[in-house]
Amino acid sequence: VRDKRTIENYGTNILGVQLAIPAMLSLFDKYGVKGTFSTVGFLFANNKEELLACCPEMKPQYTEENLSPYNSFDDVGHNEQDDPYHFGYSLLQQIKENNNHEIGSHTFCHYYCLEPGQTPETFRQYLLAANKIAAANGIVVRSLVFPRNQFNEEYLSVCREVGIDSYRGNPASWLYAGRNKNDENLLRRAFRFADTYLNLTGHHCHTKEYVMSSLL
């Protein structure tokens, strides 16, 4: 969210994750819930040196340069103790050690699949980098949540190539169809908000059979 938020106006929310994850794991254990935590590969790094070593060599050349996190790497601290805003290695270890949940991919560092300037190949490199650092931590990644719900059907073949066999899509309505930053508008956001309370677009639940038939 760094292109839209700052530590000054959003930092409290980020630090809140340090409390939220343990609380969620405790509740999941209590009620027998199994969850998927889709995580950027960035957060698998234990320190900045490891992070830099794992970054994909090929990076997206977004038309809007502010979308690229690499322009702000000088602001990243050394490790989680030094910079809890950018690192969360201990939280991932808590999820992993719980043994009841899946850790999925959110790409390496919030890859935006509908923004101008990026390509299928840079997307593939982001997924491979995320898979590699996850594997170094003993985790096999099989699922993906597209950052900002920028679902791009043309990229599903890339997902298959790197071992992703399931993904979170968007509800079948124009309100939820993937859009890039410039194509999003307040009207759609307002209708999505209203849909939360008024069910404007119908139910979006699916049977197990439907889900299984849609796997990559």
Which role fits each region the language model picked out?
Residues V1-S143, R148-L215:
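Catalytic alpha-helical scaffold of carbohydrate-active enzymes acting on polysaccharides/glycoconjugates
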